């Protein structure tokens, strides 16, 4: 898998109600979206661009020397926004793989971004994603923590069987906290965005279940820790503290 074949896309919108203007909030002297851009660039796996419908976000990324693509404001999901960005940035179809990195992971370890790619060396895999082992009962019981349920394949890789907000699987053994970072084969992303929302997707409010219900294969790489997302003022202060020390 060569760098020229990989496109890392970071969707960013001004949609947060708990943190208005979240992508542009200052973290260690630059907007949060620029911190995420830097982490993606540090991963050094391929071309990186931000996909947004907001001119202010585009201006901040451009001022930081990053690449940006404007997308429509009415997309029903982040995957649809990513697909529009892919078509605009790479109309010739040179990129075979697309990484979707959330725009609120300013402190993500760049190695975690590259860790999502190895499953796609297997031609049977359509989509790859990440998870980290859960170590507390509180995390297991939290419906805001999505659990990845999978069959071990050896090493740190498993084949996803289900994703759920419930506490699963039942009984003794590890449980895994799903991390919303995805790598798609281009053809898989094209297929995914053409599928209608599925029953389990709508029930669980988890977009990735659409792929599983359609028979697509998702493999999961297990990493050491869940990246710190920024959803609340407390999260923002934590990110500022961590990156001010970097």
From Swiss-Prot:
Cytoplasm keyword on record: yes
GO biological process: CMP-keto-3-deoxy-D-manno-octulosonic acid biosynthetic process; lipopolysaccharide biosynthetic process
Domain of life: Bacteria
An MF annotation (GO) of this entry: 3-deoxy-manno-octulosonate cytidylyltransferase activity
Broadest EC class assigned to this enzyme: transferase
GO CC, alphabetical: cytosol
Keywords: Cytoplasm, Lipopolysaccharide biosynthesis, Nucleotidyltransferase, Transferase
Pathway(s) it belongs to: Nucleotide-sugar biosynthesis; CMP-3-deoxy-D-manno-octulosonate biosynthesis; CMP-3-deoxy-D-manno-octulosonate from 3-deoxy-D-manno-octulosonate and CTP: step 1/1; Bacterial outer membrane biogenesis; lipopolysaccharide biosynthesis
This enzyme's EC code(s): 2.7.7.38
Localization: Cytoplasm
Classification via Pfam families: CTP_transf_3
Reaction catalysed by this enzyme: 3-deoxy-alpha-D-manno-oct-2-ulosonate + CTP = CMP-3-deoxy-beta-D-manno-octulosonate + diphosphate
PANTHER family: 3-DEOXY-MANNO-OCTULOSONATE CYTIDYLYLTRANSFERASE (PTHR42866), 3-DEOXY-MANNO-OCTULOSONATE CYTIDYLYLTRANSFERASE, MITOCHONDRIAL (PTHR42866:SF2)
Role noted for this protein: Activates KDO (a required 8-carbon sugar) for incorporation into bacterial lipopolysaccharide in Gram-negative bacteria.
Family classification: Belongs to the KdsB family.
UniProt-listed NCBIfam families: kdsB, PRK05450.1-1, PRK05450.1-5
Name of the protein: 3-deoxy-manno-octulosonate cytidylyltransferase
Native organism: Bradyrhizobium sp. (strain ORS 278)
């Amino acid at each position: 898998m060569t760098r020229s074949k990989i496109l890392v896309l970071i969707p960013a919108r001004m949609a947060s109600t708990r943190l208005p203007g979240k992508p542009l909030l200052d973290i260690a002297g630059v907007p949060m979206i620029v911190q995420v851009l830097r982490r993606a660039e540090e991963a050094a796996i391929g071309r990186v661009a931000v996909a947004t419908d907001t001119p202010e976000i585009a201006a901040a990324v451009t001022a930081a020397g990053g690449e940006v693509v404007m997308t429509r404001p009415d997309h029903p999901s982040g995957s649809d926004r990513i697909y529009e960005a892919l078509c605009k940035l790479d109309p010739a179809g040179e990129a075979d793989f697309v990484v979707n990195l959330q725009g609120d992971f300013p402190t993500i370890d760049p190695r975690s971004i590259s860790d999502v790619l190895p499953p796609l060396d297997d031609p049977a895999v359509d989509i790859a994603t990440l998870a980290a082992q859960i170590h507390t009962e509180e995390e297991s019981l939290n419906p805001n923590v999505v659990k990845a349920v999978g069959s071990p394949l050896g090493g740190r890789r498993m084949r996803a069987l289900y994703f759920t907000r419930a506490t699963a699987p039942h009984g003794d053994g590890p449980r895994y906290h799903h991390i919303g970072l995805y790598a798609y084969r281009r053809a898989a992303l094209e297929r995914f965005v053409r599928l209608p929302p599925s029953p389990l997707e709508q029930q669980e409010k988890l977009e990735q279940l659409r792929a599983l219900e359609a028979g697509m294969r998702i493999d999961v790489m297990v990493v050491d820790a869940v990246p710190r997302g920024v959803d609340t003022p407390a999260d923002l202060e934590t990110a500022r503290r961590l990156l001010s020390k970097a």
